[in-house]
């Protein structure tokens, strides 16, 4: 079996993010030290990198499932989890990455192009790792001082991609089977393709590096084409993708064939017809030269055979009338190879300069579109004259007449994945975030009522719940007592006199309040003394005062006071 594979489907998955920690600091003499849970580590990503040492996609055929490392969970004592290791996957230069489309369990076909890894070191992140969950120390603020929950890590991105290798060569050799393409590449370079005297010996493309003086260029041997290849005959047009990047197309024509109804001119036109059919279905990148407009040369092979030599001399003027350069060669005797080599080198040099100028012009004319800045302001509804919401709410109806509301958006779906639904406080925090984002207001605007079913997310990550808009974002009543806002520990409240540590300003204010209260009491007592309600023996005299409660009138024998 050949070790050359130029198309594979790969299932990639980024690493999951680690969960945050909901740790509480415990230290001697500090019973209320607060939260200290660290954040979870981010998951690793799957990255394809163009590597000149890679020559085939064979490894991905036998190992199509690739998963990056996951992040670890956060720990107490403010320790964050470690990041998952990125998975670096080398691919040959010239590999194109496509999004795989198709039904589950069936063969996938290429969709949108994700990357074109043409040059050494080109990188493409195809599966992003999940973000690590925040620990409770990161969730704490002045109103939520001791969160009893942490956020879960996000799942890594998971998808199918198709890798398609398109050989990067300067010259592509096309021709009928047994025209001598493999023999030509073996004679001009150090490549050692399989050579035999039967059709379709070459089943995979072969690349060879040719040296001409101080310059070098590459040639690609494309498996043989026959009329009807666009309809699937022979090897079809499967391998013609390898000529998409070549700037020069060289027709190798067998002048010694004994097959009926074949001659050099008919072979040339038959191959051009197949190339045209392939070019009609091809979507080239911006600025690329269409295949019918690329320069062509004609190589008349096997002139070491006398009859072939005569035929080559006969048809040469016909090709020159079409504006084509014609070379008569023999791969067996190496006749004409030197002239062909230097002619191809000069043509390659000319095309490289043209390509460089074209790429520079495209770079100067490129339009850069920058995304709108969304930082700082809360998005408004489109009908309010602002930007669109960061989510959408749609009213859906099932076949049985039941109605539910579907919430879609990056933030709501991400928040749902981060929530631990076994923790009531975490669920409440999610409700606060959704309300602050405007989901509840949008649900009301769409006609939702308490108890209606609401769905957030899609697929296996979807969450269903009955909408209850009565929970306030500031505080809620649990067990009949006001426990304050979610994540608030009343032991840490500033108004708690048992543990509150007063500042110097508070001490001075309390001292002045105490002194003012004492002065007010003294003034009230002095007013009562002056009114005669009481007397101070050390200050007041012993004179009889009828109005005094402490008068010194003489008492009678029967105990009555003498007037």
UniProtKB/Swiss-Prot annotation:
Family: Belongs to the TRAFAC class OBG-HflX-like GTPase superfamily. OBG GTPase family.
Function: An essential GTPase which binds GTP, GDP and possibly (p)ppGpp with moderate affinity, with high nucleotide exchange rates and a fairly low GTP hydrolysis rate. Plays a role in control of the cell cycle, stress response, ribosome biogenesis and in those bacteria that undergo differentiation, in morphogenesis control.
Key words, A-Z: Cytoplasm, GTP-binding, Hydrolase, Magnesium, Metal-binding, Nucleotide-binding
Catalytic EC class: hydrolase
Region named Disordered: 529-563
Domain OBG-type G, chain residue ranges per copy: 169-349
Organism: Bifidobacterium longum (strain NCC 2705)
EC id: 3.6.5.-
Subcellular localization: Cytoplasm
GO MF entries: GTP binding; GTPase activity; magnesium ion binding
InterPro entries found in the cross-reference section: G_OBG, GTP-bd, GTP-bd_Obg/CgtA, GTP-bd_prot_GTP1/OBG_C_sf, GTP1-OBG_CS, GTP1_OBG_dom, GTP1_OBG_dom_sf, OBG_GTPase
PROSITE patterns, per the entry: G_OBG (PS51710), GTP1_OBG (PS00905), OBG (PS51883), OCT (PS51881)
S-S bridge residues: none
Binding of Mg(2+), residues: 182, 202
A Pfam family of this chain: DUF1967
OCT domain segment(s): 383-469
Encoding gene per record: obg
Gene Ontology biological process terms, A to Z: ribosome biogenesis
UniProt main location, coarse: cytoplasm
Protein name stated in the entry: GTPase Obg
Binding locations of GTP: 175-182, 200-204, 221-224, 301-304, 330-332
Gene3D superfamilies: GTP-binding protein OBG, C-terminal domain, GTP1/OBG domain, P-loop containing nucleotide triphosphate hydrolases
Keyword Nucleotide-binding applies: yes
